[in-house]
């Protein structure tokens, strides 16, 4: 082997007498370096996280405890100073005890994270440190081997002792190369264990948050069951205040006056249930025809007036048809919002329609030379009729005018049916 080496070195220049590592070895070494750097950062971040979980503060009793435990103790102590029947004091005491339990679970989480994950990262970094020691040893043997190669290249005569040294140096270099390679493969194969430890950490964190959420949900449910009547009264007061603060529609002023007069006859004072009768009544007018797709939907014709009883969502109303005197006609159901427009006074709306007809007849008298009865209905096409009335800012349709043609049916895209 040595003789073959000398025959090879006699043909090569001096600069090529070096021991080269395989490309696969160098690629594996680069991958291990990336893994080691990432796990080193994970170890530092995990250490900071666990330390923050276990960080203790000075409590009221001058004892070290977790921040949430200190908060729980303060809540419990303050709740004892409040009356025993105080809902606030009861809830404060329950939340304080909950924080103490959460502190116990928090300590358990930190302990499990340290044992299952942090210690595992620490063991990996120890193995990586041993790998670096073996890598330094390999580099030292490589340099020794290359030094002997350089020396043998300069020698003009064959030296058996030098050949033996080269053979021994090559053996040590190959041995160290194999050892370092095995260590790198072992560090790479740890990925399966890393995945298992990471999964356990996820389970520990998930259990912690589940237990904490369960504790808080128990308190929340008990807190809701303490004073349900007070919450109902509070919500009723807020609704009443909002109603009283809103202006009243002119169409309901007469109705309100009659209601007030009848209430003055009664000897009982004005109570909260009577205020609910003041709820604003909403009227809308159909500006498009709509055919219901099932029994629950209300058929609409252009010009129909509907009293809205409930809004099922942003796109649907529930209501009943009424006449010009706000008398219910018995047809009720749900209908789309975008097929209607809101009106505020049925009487004003009716007078607007009358004035629009009179104005149309007056213009007919002015612009026409045909000697005919100008009080007869104006006969126009539906499109002309609608355009003319739109200029008068009126919501009249062709149904309100005695025309020879049928009203135009206009459809708009139907919204989605609400889940009710």
From Swiss-Prot:
Coiled coil: none annotated. Its main location: cytoplasm. It holds the Pfam family SH3_1. Keywords: Cytoplasm, Meiosis, Nucleus, SH3 domain. InterPro entries: AH/BAR_dom_sf, BAR_dom, SH3-like_dom_sf, SH3_domain, STAM. One of its GO terms (molecular function) is lipid binding. Residues 10-232 form the BAR domain. It comes from the Eukaryota. The keyword Cytoplasm applies. It is found in: Cytoplasm; Nucleus. Residues 398-420 are annotated as: Disordered. One of its GO terms (biological process) is endocytosis. Residues 279-345 form the SH3 domain. GO terms for cellular component: cell division site; cytosol; nucleus. CDD domains: BAR_MUG137_fungi, SH3. The keyword Cytoplasm applies. Has a role in meiosis and sporulation. This is Meiotically up-regulated gene 137 protein. It comes from Schizosaccharomyces pombe (strain 972 / ATCC 24843).
């Amino acid at each position: 082997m040595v003789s073959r080496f000398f025959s090879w070195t006699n043909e090569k220049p001096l600069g090529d007498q070096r021991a080269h590592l395989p490309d696969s070895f160098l690629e594996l070494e680069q991958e291990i370096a990336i893994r080691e750097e990432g796990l080193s950062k994970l170890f530092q971040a995990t250490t900071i996280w666990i330390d923050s979980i276990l960080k203790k503060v000075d409590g009221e009793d001058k004892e070290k405890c977790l921040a949430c435990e200190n908060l729980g103790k303060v809540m419990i102590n303050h709740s004892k100073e409040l009356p025993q029947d105080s809902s606030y004091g009861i809830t404060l005491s329950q939340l304080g005890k909950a924080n103490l339990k959460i502190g116990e679970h928090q300590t358990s989480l930190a302990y499990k994270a340290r044992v299952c994950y942090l210690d595992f990262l620490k063991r990996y970094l120890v193995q990586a440190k041993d790998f670096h020691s073996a890598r330094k040893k390999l580099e030292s043997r490589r340099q020794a081997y290359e030094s002997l190669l350089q020396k043998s290249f300069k020698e003009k005569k064959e030296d058996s002792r030098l050949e033996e040294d080269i053979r021994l140096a090559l053996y040590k270099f190959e041995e160290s190369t194999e050892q370092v390679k095995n260590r790198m493969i072992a560090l790479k194969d740890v990925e399966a264990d890393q995945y298992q430890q990471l999964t356990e950490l996820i389970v520990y964190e998930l259990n912690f948050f589940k237990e904490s959420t369960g504790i808080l949900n128990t308190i929340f449910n008990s807190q809701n069951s303490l004073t349900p009547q007070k919450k109902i009264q509070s919500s009723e007061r807020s609704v009443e205040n909002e109603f009283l603060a809103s202006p009243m529609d002119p169409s309901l002023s007469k109705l309100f006056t009659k209601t007030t007069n009848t209430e003055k006859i009664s000897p009982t004072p004005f109570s909260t249930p009577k205020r609910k009768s003041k709820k604003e009544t909403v009227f809308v007018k159909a500006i498009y025809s709509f055919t219901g797709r099932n029994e629950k939907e209300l058929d609409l014709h252009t010009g129909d007036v509907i009293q809205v009883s409930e809004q099922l969502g942003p796109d649907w109303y529930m209501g009943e048809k009424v006449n010009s005197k706000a008398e219910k006609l018995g047809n009720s159901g749900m209908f789309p919002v975008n097929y209607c427009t809101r009106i505020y006074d049925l009487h004003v709306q009716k007078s607007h329609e009358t004035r629009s007809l009179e104005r149309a007849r007056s213009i007919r008298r002015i612009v026409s030379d045909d000697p005919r009865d100008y009080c007869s209905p104006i006969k126009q096409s539906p499109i002309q009729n609608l355009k003319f009335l739109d200029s008068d800012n009126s919501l009249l349709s062709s149904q309100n005018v005695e025309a020879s043609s049928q009203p135009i049916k206009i459809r708009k895209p139907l919204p989605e049916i609400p889940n009710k």
